[in-house]
Amino acid sequence: MVVESNCEIPENLYYFIEGKNTVWAKLESPDTIVVGITDLAQTMAGKIVKVRIKKKGTKVEKGRPVATMESGKWAGPVPAPVTGEVVEVNAEAEKSPIIINQDPYGKGWLVKMKMSNPEELKQLFSGQAAIQKLKELIASEKLTCKRL
């Protein structure tokens, strides 16, 4: 785990980084990933008060919303890191969105997706490239991460 300005960056994840949108993906099986938002994203959003996650069985294109979130200062989409189908939804995150702020890489996961094309994972940031890209975003936004 790399920590930059109090922001946790797990090294074993894949990252979809587009502008200020930062989403992580963890390979659970050869064709299934777990998806959530990063520590940076939850810090920039502030206290998340509502999350709407696409229903199980929904097909989502890469970059299109797999969920939407609202906080006191922000509302917006959570992009799918790859194209695929929602196979499981974190009902606990929908019921108590604060867990996304408290544990974005653990209990605060959003969906599990069956990938249409597992090769798309190679297009995401990972390893040192991901760490460098996220560190640059932390610096440009002058962020210090905090958990609620």
Curated annotation (Swiss-Prot):
Residues recorded with modification N6-lipoyllysine: K73
Q: Could you confirm whether the keyword Nucleus appears in this record?
A: no
Q: Name one Pfam family in it.
A: GCV_H
Please tell me the species this chain comes from.
Saccharolobus solfataricus (strain ATCC 35092 / DSM 1617 / JCM 11322 / P2)
Q: Which GO terms describe its cellular component?
A: glycine cleavage complex
Q: Outline what the protein does.
A: The glycine cleavage system catalyzes the degradation of glycine. The H protein shuttles the methylamine group of glycine from the P protein to the T protein.
Q: What is known about its subunit structure? A: The glycine cleavage system is composed of four proteins: P, T, L and H.
Q: Which InterPro entries match?
A: 2-oxoA_DH_lipoyl-BS, Biotin_lipoyl, GCV_H, GCV_H/Fam206, Single_hybrid_motif
Recorded hits in CDD domains, A to Z, give:
GCS_H (cd06848)
For activity, the cofactor(s) needed are: (R)-lipoate
What processes in GO biological process is this protein linked to? glycine decarboxylation via glycine cleavage system
Highest taxon of source? Archaea
Tell me the ranges covered by the Lipoyl-binding domain, including all copies. Answer: 32-114
What are the UniProt keywords, alphabetically?
A: Lipoyl
Q: How is the cofactor bound?
A: Binds 1 lipoyl cofactor covalently.
**Record's keyword annotation contains Aminoacyl-tRNA synthetase:** no
The record's comment on protein family reads: Belongs to the GcvH family.
Q: What is the name attached to this protein's record?
A: Probable glycine cleavage system H protein 2
**Can you tell me where the transmembrane regions are?**
none
Q: Which PROSITE patterns match?
A: BIOTINYL_LIPOYL (PS50968), LIPOYL (PS00189)
